[in-house]
Design a protein with these regions (language model features):
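N-terminal Rossmann-like dinucleotide-binding module
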Residues: 6-39
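Glycine-rich phosphate-binding loop and adjoining beta1-alpha1-beta2 segment
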Residues: 26-63
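Long, compositionally biased stretches enriched for glycine and/or charged residues
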Residues: 187-463
Length: 463
């Protein structure tokens, strides 16, 4: 008799957990799941318990004999797991708000995965994911780690390079949304299109073809420039790309490229929100509160439509499909973060890239793109250098490397203010940055203070 699968979700109190359950329920005939463990920390106790009750209602309504467990002991959950998914946020949403508001208080972009905010999310997350990997080596050495904790590419690279854990795939919802929306914009069957993606997490481009091999990239570009929905995530302001630039490159940039191709306008929009309705993290906090009120309803046994308003919608469904592809050796085309292995010849073989892959029992097999045009090549090499410095600084706590990563980042103007933002973020996140302990103590002796009043209120409440 086939053994039922054990799935562990670290960060089980996420608002996306019902979407994860929906994805597993939809695939139950292919994935014989027996038990799901939702792991969280004490601060997330209320949310994970709400999620667990709703998840159990969803499974019961579907008529499947699957038991949902909750634990605050990660090691208890990991014992003999088959698949581990990660969707945790170190420091909770309050940390995201700090990541956004401190840079914006100095007129720099504050964003969850880009600029200074993205670097600090990596600093907080990488030590934790490496601890998880050490537990997995002992407790579930044959399990696959499916990561969709942001910044997904850097976290995945840390797992594979520093954690020495090869059975890891990083996921992102941005390619998934593009491949859902572009066929609608072109009024064609999704099964009639072939995609090829190349780049890094939240920094990739793609081309589109029909089944006869005819390129349709320019038609998607036309649809995008005409204002049609081609898959912009809900959390990104829809500033149009310059048509001349996009048509010349004949590659479809991802939504996050707006932060780089229209930096001025994206910064202006972020500053406007910062000064009025609050940053995206503050807005998401309100959205999450409403979602969890819905989840409390004892009669709710399906994913509510309101969840699609979150910027990370469809992450979870991608995770379920990835697990399905590995377990059943389906050789499914997906866009994931994995080892380069020559797919992008201008980057090192062991770099983690986000490219088209075929997913099966051996994991992800990347599809080679070949040489890139000068602009895309230059962007990727600079961004990868920034990522490598960020990851090494996250592991070592090296302040100079952290400053190097800031200097390399296109969204952080170098100079005194950049150093000030780095220092303030270190102080703001000191409870989650043990690797920077000596640096933070030095900054505190120098009386480094935080300018933003909202961040100061959050820190006071944390005490």
């Amino acid at each position: 008799m086939e053994k039922g699968l054990k799935i562990v979700t670290i960060g089980g109190g996420s608002s996306y957990t019902p979407e994860l359950m929906e994805g597993f329920i939809k695939r139950y005939n292919e994935l014989p799941i027996k038990e799901i463990w939702l792991v969280d920390i004490e601060q997330g106790k209320e949310k994970v318990n709400i999620d667990a009750k709703m998840s159990q209602r969803m499974w019961d309504a579907a008529g499947y004999d699957v038991k949902v467990h909750v634990t605050f002991d990660r090691r208890e959950a990991l014992k003999d797991a088959d698949f581990v998914t990660t969707q945790f946020r170190v420091g909770l949403l309050e940390a995201r708000i700090k990541d956004e508001r401190i840079p914006l208080s100095y007129g720099m972009l504050g964003q969850e995965t880009n600029g200074a905010g993205g670097i600090f999310k990596a600093f907080r997350t990488i030590p934790v994911i490496l601890d998880i990997v050490e537990d997995m080596k002992e407790l579930c050495p044959n399990a696959w780690l499916i990561n969709f904790t942001n910044p997904s590419g850097m976290v995945t690279e840390a797992v594979i390079k520093y954690g020495k854990w090869e059975r890891c795939i990083g996921l992102c919802n941005v390619p998934t949304i593009a491949m859902m929306k572009e066929p609608i914009a072109l009024n064609v069957d999704p099964n009639e299109l072939i995609y090829q993606f190349v780049g890094l997490n939240h920094f990739h481009w793609h081309k589109v073809y029909d089944k006869d091999g005819n390129e349709l990239t320019s038609k998607v570009i036309d649809a995008m420039l005409d204002g049609k929905d081609v898959g912009l995530p809900a959390n990104i302001n829809n500033v149009p790309f310059f048509g001349e630039q996009i048509r010349e490159m004949n590659m479809i940039p991802c939504g996050y490229h707006r932060y780089y191709y229209r930096q001025q306008e994206m910064l202006e929009h972020s500053l406007m929100e910062y000064e009025t309705i609050g940053t995206r993290g503050q807005q998401v906090k309100e959205t999450e509160n409403k979602l969890f009120e819905l989840y409390k309803n004892p009669n709710l046994d399906h994913k509510p439509e309101e969840l699609s308003k979150r910027g990370g919608a469809y992450y979870s469904d991608a995770a379920c499909e990835c697990i399905n592809a590995i377990y059943n050796n389906k050789q499914t085309h997906m866009v994931v973060s994995t080892k380069n292995r020559g797919a992008i010849p201008e980057l090192p073989e062991d770099s983690i890239v986000e490219v088209s892959c075929y997913i099966g029992a051996k994991g992800a097999m990347p599809v080679a793109w070949g040489k890139l045009p000068s602009a895309q090549r230059g962007w990727l090499q600079c961004m990868k250098a920034m990522e490598e410095c960020t990851i090494e600084a996250a592991v070592t706590g090296n302040y100079g490397l952290a400053l190097e990563a800031f200097t390399l980042n296109e969204l952080i103007p170098s100079g005194e203010n950049a150093k000030r933002v780095l220092d303030e973020l270190l102080i703001a996140h000191k409870n989650y940055l043990p690797q920077f302990k000596s640096t933070i103590e030095k900054l505190e002796k120098e009386n480094v203070t935080i300018k933003d009043s909202v961040v100061n209120e959050i820190i006071a409440h944390e005490r």
